[in-house]
């Protein structure tokens, strides 16, 4: 239940909305006076968006999802607007992904770069002392949840709001952020879980970084080999499914 609640609310990034729709469009140079002054609560992908939220459609691979979206507005091109239900109004642009990224940055300005978590504490200052086995120099952020019978290795950092289930082992020199980890998961030495993915768009004379506001969800009975990296999702999540075993030095990209 806790994992499901966190997946619905995303505790890792603060939504600064709602915003007036025309304000958002003006900020990305896509002003349209024919659109309403409706307040937009959030930006999400097609299958998770709800009423009073904005989504995007940029590829024919997602037209089936578009037909069922509950979003009120969708950034898309002329080629795909016919796939949207009557309840979802198309906002036409030839730069769907760039404009999606720019609006995401407005809602989640802290998602562009991975700042250091200034809430991390030595384990002696946390509730886990005596309940979880820790190596030396382990740091734990605010509101971290760790289940029973877990082990955290030397020099590892578990950043704020991360959830780790029962019977898990985290190796030495591991960094975990923006992640929900279920039961019986083994993450070996040197892994980095939940950092921002590699996403950007060329924009005039520079590159625009795509905000990464998704998470990493690691399901039951997973092992992740030494030195592996798993990037969090952009608008959706990166999911490592049940009973997955990854070898050493594997990179799993965002989404």
Predicted regions span which residues?
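Terminal amphipathic alpha-helical/low-complexity segments used for targeting or macromolecular assembly
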Residues: 1-124, 184, 190-191, 195-209, ...
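Structural signal for interior beta-strand "rungs" in well-ordered beta-sheet cores
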Residues: 56, 120-255
């Amino acid at each position: 239940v806790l994992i499901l609640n966190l997946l619905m609310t995303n505790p890792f990034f603060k939504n600064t909305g709602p915003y007036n729709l025309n304000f958002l469009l003006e900020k990305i140079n896509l002003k349209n006076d024919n659109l309403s002054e409706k307040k937009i609560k959030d930006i999400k992908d097609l299958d998770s968006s709800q009423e009073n939220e904005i989504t995007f459609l940029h590829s024919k691979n997602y037209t089936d999802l578009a037909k069922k979206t509950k979003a009120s507005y969708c950034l898309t091109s002329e080629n795909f607007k016919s796939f949207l239900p009557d309840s979802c109004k198309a906002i036409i642009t030839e730069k769907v992904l760039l404009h999606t990224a720019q609006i995401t940055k407005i809602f989640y300005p802290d998602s562009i770069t991975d700042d250091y978590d200034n809430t991390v504490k030595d384990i002696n200052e946390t509730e886990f002392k005596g309940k979880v086995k820790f190596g030396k120099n382990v740091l734990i952020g605010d509101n971290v949840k760790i289940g029973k019978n877990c082990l955290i290795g030397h020099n590892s950092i578990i950043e704020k709001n991360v959830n780790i289930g029962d019977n898990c082992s985290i190796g030495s020199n591991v960094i975990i952020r923006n992640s929900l980890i279920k039961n019986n998961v083994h993450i070996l030495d040197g892994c980095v879980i939940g950092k921002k993915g590699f996403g950007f768009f060329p924009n005039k004379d520079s590159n625009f970084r795509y905000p990464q506001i998704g998470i990493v969800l690691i399901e039951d009975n997973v092992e992740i080999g030494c030195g592996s990296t798993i990037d969090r999702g952009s608008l959706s999540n990166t999911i490592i499914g049940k009973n997955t075993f990854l070898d050493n030095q594997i990179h799993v990209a965002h989404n």
